[in-house]
Amino acid sequence: MIDFRPFYQQIATTNLSDWLETLPCQLKEWETQTHGDYAKWSKIVDFLPNLHADEIDLKSAVKSDRTSPLSEGEKQRIIHHLKQLMPWRKGPYHLFGIHVDCEWRSDFKWDRVLPHLSPLQGRTILDVGCGSGYHMWRMVGEGAKMVVGIDPTELFLCQFEAVRKLLNNDRRANLIPLGIEQMQPLAAFDTVFSMGVLYHRKSPLDHLSQLKNQLVKGGELVLETLVVDGDINTVLVPADRYAKMKNVYFIPSVATLINWLEKVGFTNVRCVDVATTTLEEQRKTDWLENESLIDFLDPNDHSKTIEGYQAPKRAVILANK
């Protein structure tokens, strides 16, 4: 099982120390209610070898390697373990010559977001809905002091810990398996990311308020979410599914999204990027047995989802507390 005590020790002398009032009890409770496969997944992490990487690149990729390459047998054993943690959704990872080609080219998103951010050097960062942690490692690569990701999905936690193990057990990033609604308001993070989460929230304004409560005064919010074309009065509420996803509730226009952020008290709200999701960015690979974007679009008109809605388009909004 994954041990969170090193994280408790890390934050004990930081401005996150107040979290220790609630977090250990929450995670003890979490351990009693985990997914039935969690024990198996965490053992897979244990089975991975303790390799020392001579080269780690988190600035331009998430990559580890060493001067003496692994044998083919060693590579195949690691691939076998990692594939037991499928599906791998967000990546890619390059680990000791093994290319973990995930469903999403999350480096594409990072390249869109990064140029607009306040420098991450020395910052304490929260990544809400972090998945398996790809962007967390890229934040570390930009010089973040500490990156905390939260995501309640046990598989993502085990994928994150597997990658960490193959990155010399780097402790600058940590994944906590909780949702933001379970976090006490810490007002302790310099930057808070919420990417690909808002449209899954039944109450989007509550989510925005929860993000604000985690920021220091003047801190920066990085919000990336699905949007639709339209004016300040435009919000899509899918009747049933959107792109085959049943847990999509509100997809606003950029103007509506900016209005929401201002309504909950954010300042300096600005849209810095809008991009339609491409079949190069989200696609099937050998590391994903499920359907992907091509299956979610109208086969005769890729400008629409299979349900007839506008195809996925994502905006990046920055704001300050």
Curated annotation (Swiss-Prot):
The residues that the entry says bind carboxy-S-adenosyl-L-methionine are K90, W104, K109, G129, D151, P152, T153, I180, E181, M195, Y199, R314
What biological-process GO terms show up in the record?
Answer: tRNA wobble uridine modification
Question: What keywords would UniProt list here?
Answer: Transferase, tRNA processing
- Pfam families associated with the record: Methyltransf_9
Q: Which reaction does it catalyse?
A: carboxy-S-adenosyl-L-methionine + 5-hydroxyuridine(34) in tRNA = 5-carboxymethoxyuridine(34) in tRNA + S-adenosyl-L-homocysteine + H(+)
Q: What is its EC number?
A: 2.5.1.-
> Which Gene Ontology MF annotations are present?
methyltransferase activity; transferase activity, transferring alkyl or aryl (other than methyl) groups
Q: Which domain of life is it from?
A: Bacteria
Keyword Transferase in the entry? The reply is yes
PANTHER family named among the record's database cross-references: PUTATIVE (AFU_ORTHOLOGUE AFUA_2G14390)-RELATED, TRANS-ACONITATE 2-METHYLTRANSFERASE-RELATED
Family assignment from sequence similarity: Belongs to the class I-like SAM-binding methyltransferase superfamily. CmoB family.
* The protein's role, per its UniProt record: Catalyzes carboxymethyl transfer from carboxy-S-adenosyl-L-methionine (Cx-SAM) to 5-hydroxyuridine (ho5U) to form 5-carboxymethoxyuridine (cmo5U) at position 34 in tRNAs.
Quote the subunit structure annotation.
Homotetramer.
**What is this protein identified as?**
tRNA U34 carboxymethyltransferase
Lineage runs: Bacteria, Pseudomonadati, Pseudomonadota, Gammaproteobacteria, Pasteurellales
